[in-house]
């Protein structure tokens, strides 16, 4: 995965480049945004092959790297935030990296491998994981976990409480029916991309000790990479990480009877691969291999319309 920050413009429509930052000797694999509540400075939190970078993009025409944390080499490194902390997963055996963003020297961070629950005595450990999501309640969902130390963590979703203690998250439970590649959560519902079964899963996570699958639907190209729910909660959008695949749109107003309502490609026949799609109001913003970034108007999810792109 390469970052829009470092792409040279080949063609565009309704999107324009504001600035670039080049790490020269490495490549990017994920990006997330964070706004400092103290002064509203804006930062790009970037997963790189060789570590984690925090870039000040308050002036987008002149981005400045604030700090870099070196880590084990990996093609996969994903970032999310809770409060003033960044949480970073990787498929290298580096555990969960927690970075204190109050310290812009980059010297305050932890690599956590073991997660306990003092109240229940339950625990889990992992050394690697593919991705993560943190919901509005401060619950962190670890996806695709694995271990090289003999433990056997859930590779579906592990639930951690980062709100109570951001630097020492407590283990709450897990869902382990299928491997989850990526997902997002709103309220008590997890929308999961189960890439190896090619299905969107909808999971009730209100009881972290007993999560329950409440809906499931195959995606167009049977390699479900990510899922993101609409603001009104009635629709979900998915990507399949394979050549010439579609973005899918689904009516989930009744999760026991999910209906596909539309699908759309970026550039049919080009072997372009959709990676992640995210909802922004009435639009979805999608990153692609080969085709850069696209924006679709999904005010009518039954008829998604591409309205912008940048490559």
Residue ranges and their predicted role:
Residues 1-10:
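Sec-dependent, cleavable N-terminal signal peptides
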Residues 9-311:
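Feature marking well-ordered beta-strand scaffolds used for ligand recognition
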């Amino acid at each position: 995965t390469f970052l829009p920050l470092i792409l040279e413009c080949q063609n565009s429509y309704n999107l324009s480049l504001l600035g670039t930052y080049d790490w020269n000797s490495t490549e990017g694999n994920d990006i997330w945004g964070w706004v400092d509540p103290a002064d509203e400075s804006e930062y790009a939190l970037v997963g790189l092959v060789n570590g984690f970078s925090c870039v000040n993009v308050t002036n987008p025409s002149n981005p400045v790297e604030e700090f870099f944390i070196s880590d084990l080499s990996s093609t996969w490194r994903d970032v999310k935030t809770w409060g003033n902390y960044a949480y970073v997963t990787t498929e290298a055996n580096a555990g969960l990296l927690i970075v204190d963003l109050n310290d812009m020297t980059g010297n305050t961070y932890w690599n956590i491998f073991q997660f306990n629950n003092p109240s229940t005595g339950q625990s889990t450990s992992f050394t690697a994981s593919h991705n993560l999501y943190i919901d509005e309640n401060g619950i962190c969902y670890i996806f695709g976990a694995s271990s090289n130390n003999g433990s056997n963590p859930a590779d579906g979703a592990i639930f951690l409480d980062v709100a109570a203690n951001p630097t020492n998250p407590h283990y709450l439970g897990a869902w382990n029916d299928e491997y989850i590649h990526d997902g997002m959560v709103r309220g008590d519902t997890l929308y999961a991309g189960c890439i190896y079964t090619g299905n969107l899963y909808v999971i009730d996570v209100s009881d972290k000790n007993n999560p329950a699958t409440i809906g499931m639907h195959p995606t167009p190209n049977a390699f479900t990479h990510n899922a993101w729910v609409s603001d009104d909660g009635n629709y979900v959008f998915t990507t399949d990480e394979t050549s010439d695949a579609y973005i899918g749109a689904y009516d989930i107003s009744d999760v026991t009877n999910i209906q596909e309502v539309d699908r759309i490609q970026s550039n049919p026949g080009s072997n372009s691969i959709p990676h992640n799609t995210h909802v922004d109001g009435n639009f979805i913003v999608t990153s692609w291999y080969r085709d850069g970034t696209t924006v679709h108007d999904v005010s009518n999810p039954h008829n998604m319309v591409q309205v912008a792109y940048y490559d």
